[in-house]
C-alpha cells in the first residue's frame, strides 16, 4: 500500500501552526543537501511548524510540568513516555489519522513503555556507546572503566543527565539499570563522585562539538550522533563496551494539552512516510524503526554496525523503565551531590561560609561594644 502523506486532517489544518519540541539536531533541516522536513510538511499541508529543542528527557519533563508552553508534538525516550502515560500527560492517538503507522516494524509495536500502543509512535532507536580520539588514545577501548582512567584527566566528558550517567556506573558495577534498591544507587553515586575530578564537563549536545574540535578525547554518546562523527573522521572510533549498554527508543507523542491534535497526528503520519523517514534518518544518523524506509537511505548507513548493531551487541543491552517516585527523588539528590563532588565537599563549603559569617558577626559585636564604651 502506498504511503499516505496528505489526509483530511492535514487539509483541514491549513493555516494552523503546530509546536514541535524535539531533541537538538534530530530532524533533517535542509543543510548539507538534506531535505528540510518541516518546510516540506508545510509545503504539502499548509500546516506551519514552530520547532524548538531540548537536550534531555528531564528538561522536557520540567518544561511540561512547569506549564507556560503549548506543545503539540514531543519526542521523549521510552522510559519518559511511560512516565508521561502514568501521569496522564499524553493524549491517546487516533490512528485513523496516522495510516503510515503500517510501516512501523512489528518489533517496535506494543513496547513495554506503551504496552497497549495507544500513546506513541516510534521515531528512532539506538544504543549508547563510547567514542574516542585515536590520535590521543592509542589503546583499544573496550570498557566503561576508561572514563575513570586518570591518563585522560581533563579530557573526559560525561552526560549531563542522571539516568544516562548513572547507567554507566551501574553497568560497571553489574547492576540493573532499573534497580530500586537504595544501596545500588548509593554505590553507583560513589563511583561517579570518584570520577568527578577527571571530568572536563558534564554536557549533552556539546559532546559532539567538543569531540570534533579535539577539546575532549573520550565521551559517552548516542550511536546516531556518534556515527556522524565517525563517518566524517579518520581518528574517531565508536565502541559498545563489554559491560553492555542502554538501548533506547525515542517516540512521537502528543501532550494532553495540545490545541491541534489532528494536525499533530498529520505530522506524525508525515514522518512515518518511508520516503520521508529515509531522508530524515540519512541526516540525523539514527536507526529507523521502519524497514521500508531503508530503501530510501544511504546503503552504507544501512550496513553500518554503528547505525545498526548486530545481535551480539543488542543482547547486552538494557532498556530504561520509569522508576518509582521515591527512587527518582533519590537519583536527583545523588546526582546533584555527584556533580558537586559529594556531600563532603558541600559540607566543607558550608563550614567555610559559616566560619566567615561567625567572624563577621564577632567583628560587628566588637565594634558595637567599643562604640558604646566610647560614648559612655
Segments from the language model and where they lie:
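Ligand-binding "clamshell"
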Residues: 85-92, 114-118, 228-240, 301-305
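A structural signal for short loop-to-beta-strand junctions that line the ligand-binding cleft
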Residues: 65, 69-73, 91-130, 155-157
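Ligand-binding pocket segment of bilobal, Venus flytrap-like solute-binding proteins
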Residues: 157-161, 165, 169, 177-241
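Short beta-strand->loop
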Residues: 91-102, 120, 234-246, 255-258
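Short loop->beta-strand "edge-of-pocket" segments that line small-molecule binding or catalytic clefts
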Residues: 146-162
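Conserved C-terminal helix/tail region of periplasmic/extracytoplasmic solute-binding proteins
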Residues: 311-376
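Mature extracytoplasmic/periplasmic domains
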Residues: 255-316, 360
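Early extracytoplasmic/lumenal segment of secretory-pathway proteins
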Residues: 10-83
Amino acid at each position: 500500500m502506498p504511503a499516505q502523506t496528505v489526509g483530511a486532517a492535514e487539509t483541514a489544518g491549513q493555516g494552523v501552526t503546530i509546536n514541535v519540541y524535539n531533541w537538538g539536531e534530530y530532524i533533517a533541516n535542509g543543510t548539507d543537501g538534506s531535505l528540510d522536513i518541516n518546510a516540506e510538511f508545510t509545503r504539502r499541508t499548509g500546516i506551519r511548524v514552530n520547532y524548538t529543542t531540548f537536550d534531555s528527557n528531564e528538561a522536557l519533563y520540567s518544561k511540561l510540568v512547569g506549564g507556560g508552553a503549548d506543545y503539540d508534538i514531543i519526542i521523549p525516550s521510552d522510559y519518559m513516555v511511560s512516565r508521561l502515560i502514568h501521569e496522564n500527560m499524553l493524549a491517546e492517538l487516533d490512528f485513523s489519522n496516522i495510516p503510515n503507522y503500517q510501516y512501523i516494524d512489528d518489533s517496535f509495536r506494543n513496547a513495554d513503555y506503551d504496552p497497549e500502543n495507544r500513546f506513541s509512535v516510534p521515531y528512532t532507536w539506538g544504543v549508547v556507546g563510547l567514542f574516542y580520539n585515536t590520535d590521543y588514545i592509542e589503546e583499544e577501548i573496550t570498557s566503561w572503566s576508561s572514563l575513570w582512567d586518570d591518563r585522560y584527566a581533563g579530557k573526559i566528558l560525561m552526560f549531563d543527565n542522571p539516568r544516562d550517567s548513572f547507567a554507566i556506573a551501574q553497568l560497571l558495577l553489574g547492576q540493573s539499570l532499573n534497580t530500586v534498591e537504595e544501596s545500588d544507587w548509593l554505590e553507583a553515586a560513589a563511583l561517579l563522585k570518584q570520577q568527578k575530578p577527571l571530568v572536563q564537563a558534564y554536557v549533552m549536545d556539546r559532546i559532539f562539538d567538543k569531540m570534533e574540535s579535539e577539546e575532549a578525547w573520550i565521551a559517552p554518546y548516542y550511536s546516531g550522533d556518534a556515527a556522524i562523527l565517525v563517518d566524517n573522521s579518520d581518528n574517531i572510533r565508536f565502541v559498545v563496551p563489554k559491560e553492555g549498554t542502554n538501548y533506547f527508543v525515542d517516540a512521537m507523542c502528543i501532550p494532553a494539552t495540545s490545541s491541534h491534535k489532528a494536525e499533530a497526528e498529520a505530522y506524525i503520519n508525515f514522518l512515518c512516510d518511508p520516503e520521508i523517514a529515509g531522508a530524515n534518518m540519512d541526516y540525523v544518523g539514527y536507526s529507523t524503526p521502519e524497514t521500508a524506509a531503508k530503501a530510501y537511505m544511504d546503503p552504507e548507513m544501512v550496513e553500518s554496525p554503528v547505525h545498526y548493531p548486530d545481535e551480539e551487541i543488542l543482547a547486552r543491552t538494557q532498556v530504561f523503565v520509569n522508576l518509582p517516585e521515591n527512587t527518582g527523588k533519590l537519583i536527583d539528590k545523588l546526582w546533584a551531590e555527584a556533580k558537586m563532588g559529594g556531600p563532603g565537599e558541600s559540607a566543607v563549603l558550608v563550614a567555610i561560609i559559616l566560619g566567615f559569617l561567625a567572624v563577621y558577626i564577632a567583628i560587628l559585636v566588637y565594634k558595637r561594644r567599643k562604640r558604646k564604651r566610647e560614648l559612655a
